[in-house]
């Protein structure tokens, strides 16, 4: 080793500091927004960030936030009446506002002796006066009806009963009930069909194929203003009915000879093969059906004759050869329909149309749910004239 070229380096000698070309990074402590993965929300953390990151956060805060679409409500919103003891609910605020009037002060009082009823407004008081005066100036112009009403609204509702397309027919088989208003049909189904577990109520159903004929009644028994157009044609019998099939039941029970005379014009002849004789056997529909079921030609004639059921009382059987029984003993007494009286009583209760009111229908359409208020039972009619 060449000792002359060797240079001694002192380890404690201070070395010169070399300056870096890159500028120093500036750190700032700031609240930084962070996303929460678990819940999907957001939070802010107080931590150190560089100056560049801090400037980007400031620019992002200046951008407007895009509003997120709100989810559609899955629950039904109801408006509850806050009056103490009421508790009725409504679908919209307008129905609640209309209902709230019934809880106001009733300052219009009827001055008739012994009445003293109070009302919320003068129009309802004027309508109430019609009960005391008995005025019924709105008369039905339909031929054969002549019903009178105190309010034009009740007359318009009644006129719908004379139009067939406005009827709501009961969907249950065997039930012939029909109503001019849908809510009446719902009440009928709930009372007679759903209450009995969906069973059919015993009813007399007239055949659909038969064309009903209008019975011409004397003017002295049933005038043009009567609501029972089907009257008994027999002199001295003042029975009148709203439906034609009820008149037929009455004639069948009280005047059996009338139906026998009516059916005598169109007798049914049963032709048999290989025989020159024609026999009339009206003992029962089942016997006639059995006879023609075994005969080829008579089967087609039976199908045509059974298209229109015969409602007359069966006369005595024609005596056959070798029979010693008299025609009087051979007469068959047809048993009366057991459920007829019950059906007539139910029909009589529902056949009279009560005067309906505008507020009754509004309550059904508005759909108040819970609670009952009997204070406004007297105010269930609406008039179109207001103060």
UniProtKB/Swiss-Prot annotation:
Sorted UniProt keywords: Abscisic acid signaling pathway, Activator, Coiled coil, DNA-binding, Metal-binding, Nucleus, Phosphoprotein, Plant defense, Repeat, Repressor, Stress response, Transcription, Transcription regulation, Zinc, Zinc-finger
Q: Where are the zinc fingers (C2H2-type)?
A: 79-103, 108-132, 138-162, 168-193, 230-255
Which portions of the sequence form the region Disordered? 258-387
What switches on its expression?
Induced by abscisic acid (ABA) in an ABI1- and ABI4-dependent manner. Stimulated by stress conditions including high salt, osmotic stress (e.g. mannitol) and dehydration. May be induced by ABI4 but repressed by ABR1. Repressed by darkness but induced by light.
Expressed in which tissues: Mostly expressed in flowers, to a lower extent in seedlings, stems and leaves, and, at low levels, in roots and senescent leaves.
- An example Gene Ontology CC term for this record: Ino80 complex
Concerning SMART domains, the annotation shows: ZnF_C2H2
Q: Which residues form a coiled coil?
A: 339-367
Task: Give a GO molecular function annotation for the protein.
Answer: zinc ion binding
The chain residues annotated with the modification Phosphoserine are: 284
Q: Which GO terms describe its biological process?
A: abscisic acid-activated signaling pathway; defense response; negative regulation of abscisic acid-activated signaling pathway; negative regulation of DNA-templated transcription; positive regulation of DNA-templated transcription; regulation of defense response to fungus; regulation of DNA-templated transcription; regulation of response to salt stress
- Biased region (Basic residues) positions are 291-305
- In this chain, the stretch annotated as MED18-binding covers 201-290
InterPro entries in alphabetical order: Znf_C2H2_sf, Znf_C2H2_type
Q: Which SUPFAM superfamilies match?
A: beta-beta-alpha zinc fingers
Give me the stretches of Acidic residues compositional bias. 344-363, 373-387
* Consequence of gene loss (knockout): Deregulated expression of glutaredoxins GRX480, GRXS13 and thioredoxin TRX-h5 leading to enhanced susceptibility to fungal infection (e.g. B.cinerea). Increased sensitivity to abscisic acid (ABA), drought, and salt (NaCl) stress. Reduced induction of ABR1, but reduced repression of RD29A, RD29B, and COR15A in response to abiotic stresses.
Q: What's the main place this protein lives?
A: nucleus
Kindly state the positions of the motif Nuclear localization signal in this protein.
319-326
Function per UniProt: Dual-function transcription factor with both repression and activation activities. Binds to 5'-CCATATT-3' motif in target gene promoters (e.g. ABR1). Also binds to G-rich DNA motif 5'-GGGGGCAGTGG-3'. Regulates the expression of genes involved in diverse cellular pathways, including glucose metabolism, photosynthesis, phototropism and stress response (e.g. salt, drought and osmotic stress). Regulates plant immunity, especially during necrotrophic fungal infection (e.g. B.cinerea).
- Whom does it interact with, and what assembly results? Interacts with MED18 to suppress disease susceptibility via the repression of genes glutaredoxins GRX480, GRXS13 and thioredoxin TRX-h5.
Q: Under what name is this protein listed? A: Zinc finger transcription factor YY1
What gene is this protein translated from? YY1
